[in-house]
Amino acid sequence: MAMRSHYCGLVTEALLGQTVTLSGWVNRRRDHGGVIFIDLRDREGYVQVVCDPDRPEMFKVAEDVRNEFCVQVKGLVRARPEGTTNDSLKSGKIEVLCQELNVLNPSVTPPFQMDDDNLSETTRLTHRVMDLRRPYMQRNMMLRYKTAIQVRNFLDKEGFIDIETPMLGKSTPEGARDYLVPSRVHDGQFFALPQSPQLYKQMLMVAGYDRYYQITKCFRDEDLRADRQPEFTQIDCETSFLNEEEIRAIFQRMIKEVFQQQLGVDLGEFPTMTYQEAAHRFGSDKPDLRVKLEFTELTDVMKDVDFKVFSGAANMKGGRVVALRVPGGAREEGGLSRGEIDGYTEFVKIYGAKGLAYIKVNDKAKGRDGLQSPIVKNIHDAALAEVLQRTGAQDGDLLFFGADKEKIVNDAIGALRLKVGHSEFGKKNGLFENRWAPLWVVDFPMFEHDEEEDRWVAVHHPFTSPKDGHENLMDTDPGKCIAKAYDMVLNGWELGGGSVRIHRADVQAKVFAALNIGPEDQRAKFGYLLDALQYGAPPHGGLAFGLDRLITLMTGAESIRDVIAFPKTQRAQDLLTQAPSPVDEKQLRELHIRLRNPLPAAH
């Protein structure tokens, strides 16, 4: 007989009276007064199998099966008795009366129960094969697969061609650290794994392929965070002969269709916000618009106050002073406690802030006397009045302040805004709106100044085109040069980012010069690109989405590792296979590599 006629989770009342053959895993076995019930599981879900003692041979097998045994069942689909249906299962109205039961493979005792939700990540990643059997992980992986298929179908209909680009490429030490692969054939030389297929896809545009995509792995050897992996999957796209707005329109439609089809969610309109506005209002280039808190600009107000923390920042070059108004944060009942405020003070220090000044607005009508804070005595009346007026503060509100270099203020108070908005207090007091909040952030600066190295670096990458009319600013005032760059942001996560690229060799050389990459270096690192741009390169641009991030958002998973089959830990290790691991001396010799501090040989 066939090993399987149907998936367990797809057996419904449509099959009543039919004999089915199922193969799967024993999720649970229950002995109810002489009748044995087996919950049989496969990737599509569960079905209840009933084993009656009137078939003694089959019943003996049923008595011996345990959780996670791999078994095959042949039986009759019948309606469950009244009062025993389970509406949470597709198969909840039926059960399978077992006629034959074969153990395909027994299982040792599993390291954890499949329904245990309190497992440590170390346990889950060490026993990843078993973790992947759990319905939670199977749902995540199925959604990932369905989303990837839908993206491919969408791009295919839009005329995009799937072209693979090399995994072994040239190392260019711009941006994040490369993963290097030593060449055995070319002594002392190295390939790099791609951080993105950026230059290959641009050259495909020069080659006339017009619309390209691939769903591909990218690699970055950087310190990991909750939403980062050393290898990640990108939906990588490039187009020719489309302007910035046209490119954004295609991919906005793609993401909207994915959410509609996979989740039944209408993402609605995507507002567009400039980088400048996002940083000014929210201190972030990927603002979470679900949080209803905004910065109030106070730099000009604080220039002449006696409180040196504020006046010092207000008068320093590149300094900034802002307030963050927390409605209801100073109320006697239900406001933020002293402990919570102290916790937030420690929290902002992570981002370089030296502390967190605040004012409690107890009674606005009393002016200075209605405000509670050690800093009030050092701020003159006109400044206090302006603070209250600009923030729109009401009785019971709490005002937090940030004063430092602009980057520190934006990072620290921007993070505080999210922390307060997502807190229990924020959710109870209407400071957080539970919805999908997409937007485009556009008009990024072309360059930012690296203080440590005292040089300009590219905000996106050095192949991004400046806005029309901004080319000369690269020579005269790089800080004012705006790029044709855009990011799609959803709920405070950057889902995808892209730009219109430089398609003229002279402009590309100018950007390299602004980044302090001299002519010789340009030829050595990017000569092939500069050459390609001279052969009538078309205007082109594109975008790349992080598939892992997209699925994390769609599933509501707590970690990006919950949507990747075999992820790395935050220390870039694979706990299942124990990678990375030492290699033997012979392999190193073939690669012309000697370790400076060799590991002791394992015994």
UniProtKB/Swiss-Prot annotation:
ATP binds at R220, D221, E222, Q229, E494, G546, L547, D548, R549. Disulfide bonds: none annotated. Transmembrane segments: none annotated. Its EC number is 6.1.1.23. GO terms for biological process: aspartyl-tRNA aminoacylation. It catalyses: tRNA(Asx) + L-aspartate + ATP = L-aspartyl-tRNA(Asx) + AMP + diphosphate. SUPFAM superfamilies: Class II aaRS and biotin synthetases, GAD domain-like, Nucleic acid-binding proteins. One of its GO terms (molecular function) is ATP binding. It is an enzyme of class 6 (ligase). InterPro entries: Aa-tRNA-synt_II, aa-tRNA-synth_II, aa-tRNA-synth_II/BPL/LPL, Asp-tRNA-ligase_1, Asp-tRNA-ligase_1_N, Asp/Asn-tRNA-synth_IIb, AspRS_core, GAD-like_sf. One of its GO terms (cellular component) is cytoplasm. Pfam families: GAD, tRNA-synt_2, tRNA_anti-codon. Homodimer. PANTHER family: ASPARTATE--TRNA LIGASE, MITOCHONDRIAL, ASPARTYL/LYSYL-TRNA SYNTHETASE. This is Aspartate--tRNA(Asp/Asn) ligase. It comes from Acidovorax ebreus (strain TPSY). The lineage of its organism: Bacteria, Pseudomonadati, Pseudomonadota, Betaproteobacteria, Burkholderiales.
